Design a protein with these regions (language model features):
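Transmembrane signal-anchor hairpin modules in multi-pass inner-membrane enzymes, especially those
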Residues: 1-78, 98-114, 170-184
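Alpha-helical transmembrane segments of multi-pass inner-membrane proteins
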Residues: 17, 67, 91, 107-141, ...
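Membrane-interface helix caps and helix-loop-helix hairpins in membrane proteins
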Residues: 72-81, 198-203
Length: 208
């Protein structure tokens, strides 16, 4: 596969990752599987060296530990099925790392991620203030919990937390050296993001 086509494919699959998660577990899993398959096919013929090898080894060690822990748990069947799926996140991490090595468009997907996260934050505050979000989803099932675009799953806090450090780190790295107004805007975004996680009603994520 030509490098330019590979770049566009990776850019598309990685860019829609936040949207695929909102769309549902099946779609997000399909997206991750596609990303993983294309990565494995192209990495085999690539001479590019993966960075952050220590972190990869650390994730693999954690994965082996989870599998071992599943075998010694009471309900080992449920644990083993759940923990076997963790391997896709390790491969996803490596695939994104690979994308940064081959692509000159990494800022494009981070910009897109930032826009999606800001939309979810805005939607969550709309639901918090008016009882329903932009699509009419509300607290029909979960009282005092924000569901946003997830409709019947109160996981928006975990969703935002998952992208929190990536988005904030990217924005600070790109704009922090700019003028004072941009610095204040960055801290305001950080404050709003943390506040949004807190109002979702997911206590464990708020504590984190």
């Amino acid at each position: 596969m030509e490098r330019e086509k590979l770049d566009r494919l990776y850019l598309f699959l990685i860019s829609i990752l936040p949207i695929s998660i909102v769309a549902g577990p099946s779609i997000s899993l399909f997206n991750v599987l596609l990303l993983t398959i294309f990565f494995l096919i192209n990495f085999k013929s690539s001479e590019i060296e993966i960075q952050n090898k220590f972190l990869i080894y650390l994730l693999i060690t954690l994965y082996v530990y989870l599998i071992f822990n599943s075998f010694i748990s009471i309900d080992y069947k449920e644990g083993i099925y759940r923990n076997l799926g963790f391997i896709r996140f390790i491969i996803l991490f490596i695939a994104i790392n690979f994308f940064f090595k081959i692509s000159k468009n990494e800022n494009k997907f981070l910009n897109f991620w930032s826009i999606i996260i800001l939309i979810v934050i805005f939607d969550s505050f709309i639901e918090f203030g008016f009882g329903t979000n932009l699509l009419g989803y509300g607290d029909d099932i979960y009282v005092d919990r924000i569901v946003s675009f997830f409709k019947d799953e109160p996981i928006v806090g975990a969703y935002l937390l998952g992208f929190n450090f990536v988005i904030i780190g990217y924005l600070f790295e790109r704009f922090y050296k700019e003028n004072l107004k941009l610095k204040l805007a960055l801290f305001l975004i950080l404050f709003i993001l943390v506040g949004c996680i807190l109002i979702t009603g997911e206590r464990s994520n708020g504590i984190k």
